[in-house]
């Protein structure tokens, strides 16, 4: 499966599961997501689930979004929390002008691994 193109965010989260578990001790010890895992999370577009399509997001339906957060939490609750918080920030995008959306949510504001 190509983690960047799978239409199912739960499958993308599951695909990252082993990497998340391996990083869990480091995350707990350093209180940071390792850069390689953070890049994979960005590449998987899990931070863009609730971002409207017009702003470059996936506009994921709520039940599927919750199932994806639950899948991430099975591997590490702090990863699920980070993805949840990032997506909560996306909710304002529907109320912003396109230029503002681009300034906030486009590359490299979020991560260089994310395509516009």
Predicted regions and their residues:
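N- or domain-start disorder-to-order transition segments that initiate the globular core
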Residues: 3, 7, 11, 17-20, ...
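Active-site-proximal polar cores
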Residues: 31
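Glycine-rich flavin
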Residues: 35-43, 48-116
């Amino acid at each position: 499966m190509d983690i960047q193109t799978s239409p199912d965010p739960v499958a993308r989260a599951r695909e990252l599961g082993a990497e998340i578990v391996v990083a869990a001790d480091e995350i707990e010890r350093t209180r940071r997501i390792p850069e390689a895992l953070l890049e994979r999370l960005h590449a998987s577009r899990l931070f863009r689930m609730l971002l409207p399509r017009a702003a470059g997001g996936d506009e994921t339906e709520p039940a599927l979004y919750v199932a994806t957060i639950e899948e991430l939490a099975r591997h590490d609750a702090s990863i699920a929390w980070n993805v949840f918080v990032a997506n909560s920030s996306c909710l304002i995008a529907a109320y912003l002008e396109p230029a503002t959306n681009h300034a906030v949510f486009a590359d490299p504001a979020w991560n260089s691994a994310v395509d516009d």
